[in-house]
Amino acid sequence: VHRPGELTAADRAAWSALQRARPPAEAPQLHNPFLAPEFTLAMGACRRDVRIAVVREDGVPAAFFPHQRTPAGVGRAVGLGVSDCQGLVHGPGFTGDAVELLRGAGLALWEFDHLAADQPVFADGAGARFGSPVMDVADGWESYLAGLRERSPKFTRTTLAKERRLDRDLGPLRYVHDERDPELLRVLMAWKSAQYRRTGRGDRFAKPWITRLVEHLFHTGPGEVRGLLSVLYAGERPVAAHFGLRSAAVLACWFPAYDPAYAKYSPGLVLHLAMARGAAEDGMTLLDLGRGRKEYKDSLKTRELTVTEGWVTRRHPVAFGHRMRRAPVRALRNTVQGRPELFRPADALLKRMGQFRTGG
């Protein structure tokens, strides 16, 4: 078990090689940047509780198990709460035992909420299953757009009409796929924090480690795995922006936001279409929109991957106590989110509370 800074260059190269062992078309989640060593190393630069268990066969790395841990041995997926793809990174044919893995890592339990598919080691702990919508651009932008027109004709017409109107009223429009100005990152975080407050959600950027993580990933590069800030400008003013994490094949969509002064133009949707085009032109195959019930995701997606939520445990009192505390909260949240007749009023209540707090 290593701290992130203790991994050798050879270990990091072996980790990346395991991710590339199968092509994106066969194992798209394996290429997700949240499973890359760069993300875990960035987490380690921002938090002290990050560890990596390395499974070796005949002295050669066969699997990497990044996680966070408490002194009592409660383990969590690295970045739990902000990472959209989690799991053990291993090559084809790897077999292992979850209990032995936990014992070797000194953990009583390991909790996850976005476990990737094809994780046989943790299959017994996988509970609730969720769709993770993706935009498939492997065949290019034009192919994606043609499919979007067929799947969501009204959405496509409306969004493209708003794009033309935005260009006419405030333009010309300009899209920067890889914006390197750190001031624009601060603008995005301010927009996102305001959105969290406006909709009654907890502000993720109120947690200093998340802000440090995003800034660290923004300044990482050049390289295949790094933060990617994309900005849509109308004239000289930014109207929408997105910060995500990219690998050679996958853009993990993470923090989208827009200037609410221009909400009538749906600049966030216009931005997502521009991102799809930019990703396709950059050689990527997928934009992973992440788990969660959102109408815009249903409109933009070509299909869904599967992620699961749950935990694997050893027979240990710490594991029992943690599950007793966490299970009721998780079950209630999933029940509300999974039933529209409960989710809609709960969502409306959060938004009213947000408006009250912000004076809206």
Put a short name on every predicted segment.
Residues 84-91:
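The substrate-binding groove and active-site-proximal loops of carbohydrate-active enzymes
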Residues 46, 80-84:
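Short glycine-enriched loop/turn motifs at secondary-structure junctions
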Residues 58-59, 92-93, 136-141, 235, ...:
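Short loop segments at secondary-structure junctions
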Residues 1-58, 62-75, 115-132, 146-264, ...:
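A conserved beta-strand-loop-helix scaffold within acyl/acetyltransferase catalytic domains
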Residues 120-150, 248, 284-345, 349-354, ...:
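Active-site/acyl-donor-binding loops of N-acyltransferases
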Residues 73, 83, 96-104, 204-322:
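Aromatic (often tryptophan-rich) hydrophobic motifs at membrane interfaces
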Residues 94-139:
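Non-catalytic accessory segments adjacent to catalytic cores
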Residues 82, 106, 126-129, 169, ...:
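A short, structural micro-pattern
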